[in-house]
Amino acid sequence: MSAFEEMEEDGTIWMNGEYVDWEDATVHVLSHAMHYGTGIFEGVRAYDTEEGTAIFRWEEHLDRFYNSAKPYDMEIDFSREELTEATLEVIRRNDLDSAYVRPLAYYGYDSLGVSPGDCPTDVSVAAWPWGAYLGQEALENGIKVEVSSWRKHASSQIPTNAKTTGLYVNSMLAGEEARRHGAEEAIVLNKEGNVAEGPGENIFLVRDDELYTPGLSESILDGITRDTVITLAEERGYEVHDNVSISRGELHTADELFFSGSAAEVTPIRQVDNIEIGNGGRGPVTEELQTAFFDLVNRRTDDHEEWFTYV
């Protein structure tokens, strides 16, 4: 199932401490988050391994979830242990061998001033089957992308290190613009005109067998898959420059480009703005790191056992 296929509307979702049927997991139309985008979320994958279903880097995702709530003074009234057990149980109840997991916290229904006031913080966890985000073929052949006319907001405007629901309007605009023009995904630039990231992915550039990825000061989300790729690359002897500025023009002259993300995993980029990148397909460095990533998450290696939470 790709990102653009319909989800099956059945199963169980955890909401505010209760397990409810999928069709009953609803919110009030006057919820604060519905009007002002005041929610935070995570996207996490669980993989079907020989040792059972395993959530990848759950603890790091939980860290970011709670940290994302802080700029919005959002109090999450459930402990890490409660959210972990809720997530494991949702996966069990939905009988999922592999899954995409979506923890969500948002200001709910009470009042509709811009200030959330006494609005409650509602919390939910859903999980469903979700295959390659941009399609299985994209993992092998790469995707066509377009640099968007929409710019990424700066951290001086809205906290870019928080995974905030409302901020993804920017991502939606960029992605849909690219798809209208025949591309499969977008790249957004920051306010200085340097490369930031994809709508839901971090980006890596390969040049002379070295890796470059925009630093946190470039208005990017501190991606957990980004960190995974950096670790895997350094373990394989690659030099990684993870705090750089990348110009738009550098994209076109790269040896290789690829996206990373919990949904996108490791997806090669074969073309930017109708300009072929490298050999026009998945480059050798990208292929090596992609293979290492999938070997890791599917537990075909014993490396980094600490990154897995078993259902």
Predicted regions and their residues:
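Helix-start/capping segments and mature chain N-termini
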Residues: 1-78, 85-89, 112-311
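Short, acidic/charged, Gly/Pro-enriched secondary-structure junctions
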Residues: 83-98, 104-110, 128
